[in-house]
Amino acid sequence: MSKVIGKVAQIIGPVVDVVFNGKDVELPKIYDSLEVTKKDGTLLVLEVQSHIGENTVRTISMDSTDGLSRGYEVVGTGNPIQMPIGPDVYGRLFNVVGDAIDGLGNLPKTGENGLPIHRQAPKFEDLSTSSEVLFTGIKVIDLIEPYAKGGKIGLFGGAGVGKTVLIQELINNIAKGHGGLSVFAGVGERTREGNDLLREMLESGIIKYGDDFMHSMENGGWDLSKVDMPGMRESKATFVFGQMNEPPGARARVALSGLSIAEYFRDGAGSDQGKDVLFFVDNIFRFTQAGSEVSALLGRMPSAVGYQPTLATEMGAMQERITSTNKGSITSVQAVYVPADDLTDPAPATTFAHLDATTVLSRKIAELGIYPAVDPLDSTSRILTPHILGDEHYNCAQRVKEILQKYKQLQDIIAILGMEELSEEDKLSVSRARRVQRFLSQPFHVAEQFTGIPGVLVDIKDTIKGFNMIIDGELDHLPEAAFNLKGSIQDAIEAGEKMLAEA
């Protein structure tokens, strides 16, 4: 098919109108990508959003439109934006349009080497329905809101309560222990965090650049000529970034770009068998935020709180693709920024509907110095049932929630009248609840550099044993501080006895 050629007719920020003159010209389809070569030789990719008038299409640019002017030639590709696939994508970093941003050269992404970013969700009969627990080694998560393998997990929290640290710890714990493939989509977050994450992945061996490169990195260098390209195929992760400084078009599409690579890993192709994939998104709110910017630029009438009228449709189209099939599974962990700590805001509220487990991070708990600042009473999981987890786990989780709920109800009385006015039974409940609350904290591997405490993974059996001992009153003699930032109950007992001996 011959390529359709048009001209730039109007530019308003990231919105570019393209006119296609000539008789019987076939306009590009919705979501097709168009390409413009700027004067400096860089290629700008546009995505068709709507047809306006007889020969004109309205597009959103995937990069800055600086330097573009009316009259520039635009070439239709005949396809949506394509992402590269195949064994060479392991260990690589891409942007929203599938170009490499790690300085190691682009990969082919046309024909059988590429996948479009806009695809249908798997058919109903292809879906997998098994329920299996994915243990993370993080006490509060494994006990109170266990994650399902092949499920969708949301980390909700306002600014600065620890979403990115928690997602990095999950990558560290699950990606290392899971041994499978991970895809990380950085959507509208800080570029610095992407840089930190890449260095962390190299140090932990999840991404392999080879020994020569690692020696140069240890000495403060970043010599890409030393990267072992064939050895990179042994890597276990791929990154797709569209960070805060990108135009809204890129931020609105980068989650889909990452998802296409995750779908390729899940379904396999040719000799590649389907696999179990971990798909991390930081931050899904920025996907909604960028969609709202794009919607306003395209002149659509906003709905509640200024969000796009198509919010539920866009979220549904993306979330329904993140699922497990008979070939493989995608377990997705999505950080969700909560504007002004308001969980009823349309963006987090729309995301809630799609999730199997929710981990809510609370500023009040962060203020107490308890990290991870997970709110055990607000967080939920679909698989917190006795027939999936067993009676012992389920009963322990319910006892922990019960004692924390009782403490929460008594807090007003304590604030007004003080502890002295409580009954002996209530005083005992409060002291045990405070120990439980502190024991829900845990030192993280990725936070070692600023806590100075080595990170730990805690087995679920140790977690259940520890909380049962606290609630049964076996550790009432130990000071509360002994339970803060400890891994297993044994660590807490040792610390407590040491404190008593020193007192």
From Swiss-Prot:
ATP binds at residues 157-164. CDD domains: ATP-synt_F1_beta_C, ATP-synt_F1_beta_N, F1-ATPase_beta_CD. PROSITE patterns: ATPASE_ALPHA_BETA. One of its GO terms (cellular component) is plasma membrane. It is found in: Cell inner membrane. Its EC number is 7.1.2.2. It is a peripheral membrane protein. Keywords: ATP synthesis, ATP-binding, Cell inner membrane, Cell membrane, CF(1), Hydrogen ion transport, Ion transport, Membrane, Nucleotide-binding, Translocase, Transport. InterPro entries: AAA+_ATPase, ATP-synt_VA_C, ATP_synth_F1_bsu, ATPase_a/bsu_AS, ATPase_alpha/beta_chains, ATPase_F1/V1/A1_a/bsu_N, ATPase_F1/V1/A1_a/bsu_N_sf, ATPase_F1/V1/A1_a/bsu_nucl-bd. It catalyses: ATP + H2O + 4 H(+)(in) = ADP + phosphate + 5 H(+)(out). Its main location: membrane. It holds the Pfam family ATP-synt_ab. Produces ATP from ADP in the presence of a proton gradient across the membrane. The catalytic sites are hosted primarily by the beta subunits. Belongs to the ATPase alpha/beta chains family. This is ATP synthase subunit beta.
